[in-house]
A protein has these predicted regions:
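Flexible loop/turn connectors
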Residues: 241, 245-347
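Append "Primarily bacterial transcriptional regulators
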Residues: 1-4, 30, 283, 335
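Hinge/beta->alpha junction and helix N-cap segments in small-molecule ligand-binding domains
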Residues: 64-74, 95-101, 145, 154-163, ...
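N-terminal helix-turn-helix/winged-helix DNA-binding helices
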Residues: 35-69, 88
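Short beta-strand elements of ligand-binding domains
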Residues: 93-97, 117-120, 135-145, 180, ...
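Residues within the alpha-helical elements of helix-turn-helix
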Residues: 3-4, 15, 36
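Short beta-strand-centered segments that line the small-molecule binding cleft or hinge
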Residues: 102-157
Length: 347
């Protein structure tokens, strides 16, 4: 191209990337020659190698790609990420992680990005190790007690937030309680599980929420062994319904179900409304997140700012603060009481 027009290679490059550096007539002559020669322009991969950056940030999550477009909390989180990315003139790459760690590791190693938002990763330590080995920055969306001064995160106090909604339910007199969460243990079946305690839970977010629920009930004399932990095979309404199938049919069914997400809680409400015998047990149900559907269903829940979490995560990645402490962000949560919870029914 440069030889055909009689200019330097840098002048050809400027015609595409810095047109203000040459006259309009010269730029048009270069572009016209490119069209005649079939030259498509600078190779973006080669350009990124020369510049030392790609112009894209990655969002890691342990789920299928469709999760990013169907989960209501994820959609709002990614809205926040994309808003910040647009302000910084960069793009966003979704990096779903397969369940197998070998494939998941390759996904992190091969992602063409300048840094990562580590969002909703079940066991994130190995992912952080791979990112560090690549020499790339990252921001976690899970608050980490062991975070170093150079690590950045934006999250909530999962345990305290969960404790607040559980204390509300305990205050209504409920003592026979089920705790419902997604993927409590790797490869566990749907339905009730036997756990020695919250420390066995796989996912750090789920672990924080289940432990917070248990904290509140321990204060009223209900120990971990007296709580029914229920595993759902996915964060979806059908998965929640399948997980609680038969849960209310025994002689002493739970009078309340505390779910680790609004989506799961809505699935429990669906299951209660669709019982084959036409009866709807007087069960209190709570969620977590306060997605738009929660208000319409009258769901008691914990509100957390999804879009703010995404926006701040991307800002911390793209414009890191000079003060390391400013890179550790805890967002506020709020208990939202609605009609889905009430006093324990009298015998």
């Amino acid at each position: 191209m440069a030889d055909a027009v009689g200019v330097s290679r840098s002048t050809v490059s400027n015609a595409y990337s810095r047109p203000d550096q040459l006259s309009a007539a010269l730029r048009e002559r270069i572009l016209d020659a490119a069209r005649q020669l079939g030259y498509p322009g600078p190779n973006p991969t080669a350009r990124s190698l020369r510049r030392g950056f790609v112009g894209s940030i990655g969002v890691l999550f342990t789920s299928q790609l469709s999760y990013a477009f169907t989960d209501p909390f994820a959609v709002r989180f990614l809205t926040g990420v994309s808003a910040a990315a647009e302000r910084h003139g960069t793009s966003m790459l979704l990096v779903p992680l397969p369940r197998g760690q070998t494939d998941a590791r390759q996904a992190v190693e091969n992602a063409a990005v300048d840094g990562f938002c580590v969002y909703c990763v079940a066991d994130e330590e190995w992912a952080l190790d791979v990112i560090r080995a690549r020499g790339l920055p990252y921001v976690s969306t899970a608050a980490r007690d062991d975070a170093g001064a150079d690590e950045r995160y934006v999250g909530i106090d999962e345990r305290a937030a969960a404790r607040s909604v559980a204390a509300h339910v305990a205050g209504l007199g409920h003592r026979r309680v089920a705790l419902l969460a997604d993927s409590v243990l790797p490869d566990a079946p749907a339905g009730p599980l036997t756990l020695a305690g919250g420390h066995e839970v796989w996912h750090p977010t789920t672990r924080g929420r289940l432990t917070g629920f248990a904290d509140a009930f321990r204060e009223v004399g209900v120990g971990w062994a007296d709580l029914t932990v229920v595993n759902a095979l996915g964060n979806s309404r059908p998965a929640a319904g399948a997980a609680v199938a038969g849960l209310f049919d025994g002689p002493a069914p739970p009078t309340a179900v505390l779910a680790g997400s609004d989506v799961l809680a809505l699935g429990v409400l669906d299951a209660l409304a669709q019982r084959a015998d036409g009866t709807r047990p007087p069960v209190s149900v709570t969620g977590f997140d306060d997605v738009p559907e929660a208000a319409a269903a009258g769901l008691t829940t914990v509100r957390q700012p999804a879009e703010d979490k995404g926006r701040i995560a991307a800002e911390l990645l793209l414009d890191p603060p000079a003060d390391a402490a400013a890179g550790h962000v805890l967002l506020p949560t709020a208990l939202v009481v609605r009609a889905s919870t009430g006093p324990v029914p009298r015998s």
